[in-house]
UniProtKB/Swiss-Prot annotation:
Modified residues (2-(S-cysteinyl)pyruvic acid O-phosphothioketal): 116
Gene: murA2
Enzyme Commission designation: 2.5.1.7
An example molecular function term from Gene Ontology annotations: UDP-N-acetylglucosamine 1-carboxyvinyltransferase activity
Keywords noted in UniProt: Cell cycle, Cell division, Cell shape, Cell wall biogenesis/degradation, Cytoplasm, Peptidoglycan synthesis, Pyruvate, Transferase
Species the sequence originates in: Mesorhizobium japonicum (strain LMG 29417 / CECT 9101 / MAFF 303099)
Subcellular compartments: Cytoplasm
Protein name as catalogued: UDP-N-acetylglucosamine 1-carboxyvinyltransferase 2
Catalytic reactions on record: phosphoenolpyruvate + UDP-N-acetyl-alpha-D-glucosamine = UDP-N-acetyl-3-O-(1-carboxyvinyl)-alpha-D-glucosamine + phosphate
Length: 418
């Protein structure tokens, strides 16, 4: 099992190429199952979650032709098989194949999902959306069993909260429904809008994605398509914090300011400078870090996927910061590991009080999930001495060559193979 060895104290400088968004790629790979025609996805990140999702569509008979940062998915011979727990236990996003399989074949059997251990994250809203479209749903022996032998029917779906996964599930299923579907209280994330753009390229007629109200025409006439995945705003935010925490300057190539307004606003409140460059965003810090409070919110609010990274940053700021997590329960699993490095953090329910300014020191730490693991990397970059981070397979799920990208910008980091 690989580990990372990091010696702190180096200022990061240079340029980082931001990869395609993992959280946009996964539903688009699943969406390929909707159509019998090939879908080519470009700007595809080279991360294990993407490889696992490609494996899931292969399981259902898709032929995948892979090249550097691209894949062509041909599902002309696809079938709806049972997606077993052994297949899906590695990541929660595999539940996204449920809607495409049901919509195209009229039946689907998908195991209840696994993934990061950061709370229950139930699929109730996914199931409710499919039921609203006319599907019959049952949970049997850990499987979601869905059927719609006479097809799906367009309807109005009101989500109880703006869930990204439920919005994507409803949107994909509605593309083949008879008549129009309206989704209200839809998630507004850029990844949702990018899925709609991909589906429209494939032949769907979707309007309003990126707002709280999405309209899907239904009865889609599919055709072959090509789609370029948006840059990863979470990866961009992570490297922005890396520049900030080390007092460096990084150019984030391909990063889009319009997807990162809440992140940029909070970084600027801590004394970090962010401005657009010719190829993306430039992030720089020359002044001492100031403490700032944070509340995670659905987009366009501050993303929960950057909460752990921002906590690492606040460990280095003068003063106290209060971080409130409102999206997922149990998403402070990184706190004990940050404290092993010397951080002063107190937890109370869904809040964390960070008293910054303490000197961090290298230690052996363990990654517990994807975003928690990268917060440990950020803290290690400014810790005195050597830090060893175990279980870095969590990092590889969502960050493409993170150690290489950091090393090219001046970090003292190496991957140790077991």
């Amino acid at each position: 099992m690989d580990r990372l060895r990091i010696v702190g104290g180096r200022r990061l400088e240079g340029a980082v190429t931001i990869s395609g968004a993992k959280n946009a790629a996964l539903p688009q790979i699943a969406a390929a199952l909707l159509s019998p025609y090939p879908l080519e996805l470009t700007n595809l990140p080279d991360v294990t979650d993407v490889e696992n999702m490609l494996g899931v569509v292969r399981l259902h008979g898709a032929e995948v032709t892979r090249s550097a940062h691209a894949a062509t998915i041909d599902t002309s011979a696809a079938v709806s098989k049972e997606t077993s727990y052994d297949t899906v236990r590695k990541m929660r996003a595999t539940v996204l194949v449920l809607a495409p399989l049901l919509a195209r074949f009229g039946h689907a059997r998908v195991s209840l999902p696994g993934g990061c251990a950061i709370g229950a994250r139930p699929v109730d809203m996914h199931v409710a959306a499919l039921a609203a479209l006319g599907a019959k749903i049952a949970i049997e022996n850990g499987l979601i069993v869905a059927s719609a032998p006479n097809g799906l029917t367009g309807t109005r779906i009101v989500l109880s909260s703006p869930s990204v996964g439920a919005t994507e599930t409803a949107m994909m299923a509605a593309t083949t429904a008879k008549g129009e579907t309206e989704i209200l209280n839809a998630a507004r994330e850029p990844e949702v809008a990018d899925l709609a753009a991909c589906l429209n390229a494939m032949g769907a007629r979707i309007e309003g994605a990126g707002t709280h109200r999405i309209l899907i025409a239904g009865d889609t006439g599919w055709h072959a398509a090509r789609h370029d995945i948006i840059p990863d705003r979470i990866e961009a935010g992570t490297y922005a914090i890396a520049a900030a925490i080390t007092g460096g300057q990084l150019e984030l190539t391909h990063a889009r300011l319009e997807h990162m307004a809440s992140v940029v606003q909070l970084l600027e409140a801590t004394g970090v400078s962010v401005w657009p460059g010719d190829r993306g965003l430039i992030v720089s810090r020359e002044r001492p870090l100031k403490a700032a409070d944070l509340t995670t919110e659905p987009y366009p609010g501050f993303p929960t996927d950057l909460q752990a990274q921002f906590m690492a940053l606040m460990c280095c700021a003068e003063g106290a910061s209060l971080l409130r997590e409102t999206i997922f329960e149990n998403r402070f699993m990184h706190v004990p590991e940050l404290m092993r490095l010397g951080a002063n953090i107190k937890l109370q329910g869904t809040m964390a009080l960070v008293r910054g300014g303490e000197k961090l020191h290298g230690a052996q730490v363990m990654a517990t999930d994807l975003r928690a693991s990268v917060s440990l990397v950020l803290a290690a970059l400014v810790s005195e001495g050597e830090t060893i981070i175990n279980r870095v397979y969590h990092l590889d799920r969502g960050y493409e060559q993170l150690d290489r990208k950091l090393r090219l910008c001046g970090a003292d980091i190496e991957r140790l193979s077991a």
